[in-house]
A protein has these predicted regions:
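Gram-negative and organellar
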Residues: 1-544
Length: 544
């Protein structure tokens, strides 16, 4: 066995709940003696009593033997570069002792490196405050943009001098060329005109020295009749200078989307004794946003086959770099992200060795730096059977029903969002299967499993800036002016078949040294996530 998992703030397993993915993986709640994601009991009532007693004594000895454990792993999540895409590299070093000759105290350090890439294209537009940068500036709406800028000078002063020059070019009304200036600068063109037109020019200037070239040409269209091609080009260029002209593509240079990466070291201290497990620690020190995390689990047996599991915890949300490590909004320099989930979970399960059932629910409150607060509700129920079971192997087959609800859709990456999957409703029915076994020598233990099922989620429309009414108001003004298309992320839904496959093994070199590895892959729609981990564990004493 790899030893007990202690709670961490990374993508590694925690005592109660793995982090929710950007699109949820199927719930693989197929319990077994080797792998049991929700802690269901696995009483082997059909084994001889002597074997039960021997195993219980062995477990007690194992729970107090000190050990050192190290692992290295990688987690990769598909998504948009700089936003939902994520590659996590991590290594864990754990030391466990039994200071009071009962229970186990485990100290863990975990270096973590995250890389999300660089926001690009439309992804850059939806990052931070970049949605404020107009996408369509034309002759019909540039004056509305000028008014918005004047009314919100504090926001636009966040631009660099170079960026302000681009914005200034977008909102500047061109100076009209006067008729007097054109005549003075282009005597050859004037000389080619008829006497009547030259007289008309003199009369117009005498009446109003500020008469513009464009108004004169509009009143005297015959001016084009006597010009050469070259002279027509001169007149056309002078008139064009009077017209508003701006390349909207230049506005993209105002967006700021730096590479998204971070690294740090998470620390954790855990203690387990009897039915109680407790841990406390930090998200990686060195991350932009750092949090204290931890939890307590109490899992008493209500009968020989029934277990109650109560959990209170505060955990990091590891869906994305934004939700996990946090980042810096590039215009304001404000820290943003680093979301934690705080709440509790209740699970009840019954397992007679052949058939098991379970059910429970959870409530969490989610908060982060400059991220709108949120609430999460969960419910799950399921059952399983073991159609095949021997002394060294067993097959579990089950069905799982899950429901998930978040108060708000905060799954985006503009300022105020948290970058984590948060649908207003999510339903899943899945059919997990898992096979576990042990070699005759007892040196090998292995698990392989998977699940397939149907999932559906729905999410509400969400404002780009849920924590800042002023910024959201600017966006809505820009929508009214036709400068951008929307100030809200659209509501949406998705349904379909999802799947999961996972496996792992342990190999005992001797009575003190064990190595192992595990891998998993989840997929639903465009979402997929994979992970691989290898470990080595060394007992510091030989079991008697």
């Amino acid at each position: 066995s790899a030893g007990p998992q202690i709670a961490t703030t990374t993508g590694t397993p925690a005592p109660t709940q793995a982090p929710a993915p950007a699109y949820p993986a199927l719930a693989v709640n197929t319990p077994s003696t080797a792998s049991n994601p929700i802690g269901l009991p696995a009483a082997a009532l059909n084994d001889p009593m002597s074997r039960d007693i021997a195993r219980e004594l062995a477990d007690l000895r194992q729970n107090t033997i000190p050990f050192v454990r190290g692992d290295v792993g990688i987690r990769s999540r598909d998504g948009e570069s700089g936003l939902s895409e994520l590659t996590e590299l991590g290594a864990t070093l754990s030391v466990a002792v039994s200071p009071f000759d009962e229970g186990r105290l485990t100290v863990t350090a975990r270096p973590v490196s995250l890389d999300s890439g660089t926001p690009e294209g439309d992804g850059a537009r939806r990052f931070g405050l970049n949605a404020l940068v107009p996408t369509t500036v034309t002759e019909s709406n540039y004056q509305a943009l000028a008014t918005i800028v004047d009314n919100n000078a504090g926001v636009w002063n966040l631009l660099t001098p170079t960026e302000k020059q681009i914005l200034g070019a977008a909102i500047t009304t061109p100076d009209a060329t006067t008729l007097t200036d054109f005549v003075t600068s282009n005597p050859t063109v004037v000389a080619a005109l008829t006497d009547d037109l030259r007289t008309a020019i003199t009369t117009a200037v005498a009446a109003d020295a500020a008469t513009t070239l464009s108004s004169f040409v509009s009143d005297n269209p015959t001016i084009w009749n006597d010009l050469t091609t070259a002279q027509e080009s001169v007149l056309s260029a002078a008139l064009a200078a009077d017209s508003y002209s701006f390349d909207t593509a230049r506005m993209a240079a105002l967006r700021r989307a730096p590479p998204q990466d971070d690294a740090g070291v998470a620390l954790a201290l855990a203690y387990e004794i009897g039915d109680i497990k407790a841990d406390a620690g930090t998200t990686p020190l060195g991350f932009e946003v750092q949090n204290v995390v931890g939890g307590v689990t109490y899992a008493p047996r209500l009968s020989e086959t029934t277990t109650l599991k109560l959990t209170g915890e505060r955990r990091a949300v590891t869906d994305s770099l934004l939700s996990y490590a946090g980042t810096v909004e590039p215009f304001t320099g404000k820290r943003w992200g680093g979301v934690t989930r705080t709440g509790g979970r209740v699970m009840v399960s019954d397992d007679d060795g052949d058939v098991g059932i379970y059910g429970g629910g959870a409530y969490y409150r989610l908060e982060g730096d400059n991220v709108d607060s949120n609430q999460q509700l969960e419910a799950t129920v399921g059952a399983y059977i073991r159609p095949y079971k021997t002394e060294r192997a067993e097959l579990s087959v089950g069905v799982n029903l899950s429901y998930l609800n978040y108060e708000k859709n905060l799954g985006e990456f503009s300022f105020g969002h948290g970058g984590y999957f948060s649908p207003q409703s999510f339903y899943s029915v899945s059919f997990p299967v898992e096979y576990t076994g042990e070699s005759r020598s007892g040196k090998w233990n292995y698990t392989i499993g998977g699940a397939i099922g149907y999932q559906r989620y729905e999410k509400d429309a969400a404002p780009y800036f849920p924590t800042d009414g002023k910024l959201q108001g600017i966006l809505e003004d820009e929508v009214s002016a036709g400068l951008i298309s929307s100030a809200y992320y659209a509501a949406g839904s998705e349904s379909g078949v999802g799947g999961n496959i996972h496996g792992g093994f342990d190999y005992a070199f001797d009575r003190q040294t064990t190595v192992g590895a595990s891998a998993s892959f989840d997929s639903f729609g465009d979402y997929s996530e994979s992970s691989v981990m290898v470990y080595v564990k060394r007992l510091l004493e030989v079991a008697p």
